[in-house]
Structures are given as C-alpha cells and as structure tokens.
Amino acid sequence: MLLELSEEHKEHLAFLPQVDSAVVAEFGRIAVEFLRRGANPKIYEGAARKLNVSSDTVQHGVEGLTYLLTESSKLMISELDFQDSVFVLGFSEELNKLLLQLYLDNRKEIRTILSELAPSLPSYHNLEWRLDVQLASRSLRQQIKPAVTIKLHLNQNGDHNTKVLQTDPATLLHLVQQLEQALEEMKTNHCRRVVRNIK
C-alpha cells in the first residue's frame, strides 16, 4: 500500500534535500519529540538560526516529516512501499535511505505513542430495561404512550458507571433499525478497507 501525500505535505518535505543528512536525522528526532510532548517553538527557532532560514520553514519541514512517519507507522507500510512512497518526492537515494532508516527505527515507538493518544472510550458491560405503561386513569383523555427505560452499565479504564435513558418505543425501534443498517454497512468492501487502514 502506497502512502499518498498531498501537495502541501510535498511542499513541506521539499525543504529536506536542501539540508545535510545529519540535519534530517535531527528533524526525525524532533518529529518523534513533537509526538511525545507537542510543538516546541524554541527548537524551531534555534534550528532556523543555524540553517539561516525562517522558523516556519523548519516547522513545516518537521511537521511534514512527522506526518510521513505517523501515517506510515499507522498503516504499517512495508519497507518497499515506504521507499516507493518516498521515491515519488524525487529525493536523492541517500535521503530516501535515511528516511527509510528513520521510519524503521521509530515505527514501533510512534505506534505506541499514537495508541496512548487515542481516546479511551467506554465499553458495554450490561443492560437492564423496563417498559413503563400506565394501565388506567380517569383524568387522561388522550392515548397513553408507553416508555422504555434503559439502564446501561459501562466500563471505562476499570471504572464502572451507569447511564439511565428513557425513550418511546417508536424512537427505540428507529434506533435499532439505524444500528442494524450500520452493521450491514460494515460488511461492505469499502468499510472493511477503511477499518483495516485504521488499525
């Protein structure tokens, strides 16, 4: 699977052939630090002074390299596919090898960082439900609508919490139909490809 880069990312990476290979390696280290701790403008300014370029140019170069490494790591691109993806950029063979080495050295760490950054969503534990219907009343003249009360038990990071929801049967039926439609859509080839690429 080849990584497709937008024109903007190609422009950001176009700065790399203009600098020494040691600088590109340092940019790779800064890119991994960027993932761990976030952006640090002082590092960009210091590198920009040494290279006699604007700090925006350095920042764009690091961000382009960060995108290249994170997307490649996220998709678990093979060595050959990574080389083919970078070859399109028109870099020298030495720079392509250096980028490949950066990718191979850091892909496990980048995947670990990305998994830590992913939001922790609650997961289903148990469900209780009750149908509430008023059987008789002298004062009500309109039709009585039943209500479905749902008690949803969830787990999140080892903590158990409970959500109580109430709805009418028509809305619940519509919700069930939408969920069944979504599950059917997950069986399509397009969705399978998307899910495979997310992992």
Curated annotation (Swiss-Prot):
The keyword Transmembrane does not apply. Coiled coil: none annotated. PROSITE patterns: COMM. Residues 123-190 form the COMM domain. Ubiquitous. It is found in: Cytoplasm. One of its GO terms (cellular component) is cytoplasm. Keywords: Cytoplasm, Transcription, Transcription regulation, Ubl conjugation pathway. It comes from the Eukaryota. Component of the commander complex consisting of the CCC subcomplex and the retriever subcomplex. Component of the CCC (COMMD/CCDC22/CCDC93) subcomplex consisting of COMMD1, COMMD2, COMMD3, COMMD4, COMMD5, COMMD6, COMMD7, COMMD8, COMMD9, COMMD10, CCDC22 and CCDC93; within the complex forms a heterodimer with COMMD3. Interacts with RELA, RELB, NFKB1/p105, NFKB2/p100. Interacts with CCDC22, CCDC93, SCNN1B, CUL3, CUL4B, CUL5, CUL7. Belongs to the COMM domain-containing protein 2 family. Scaffold protein in the commander complex that is essential for endosomal recycling of transmembrane cargos; the commander complex is composed of the CCC subcomplex and the retriever subcomplex. May modulate activity of cullin-RING E3 ubiquitin ligase (CRL) complexes. May down-regulate activation of NF-kappa-B. This is COMM domain-containing protein 2. The gene is COMMD2.
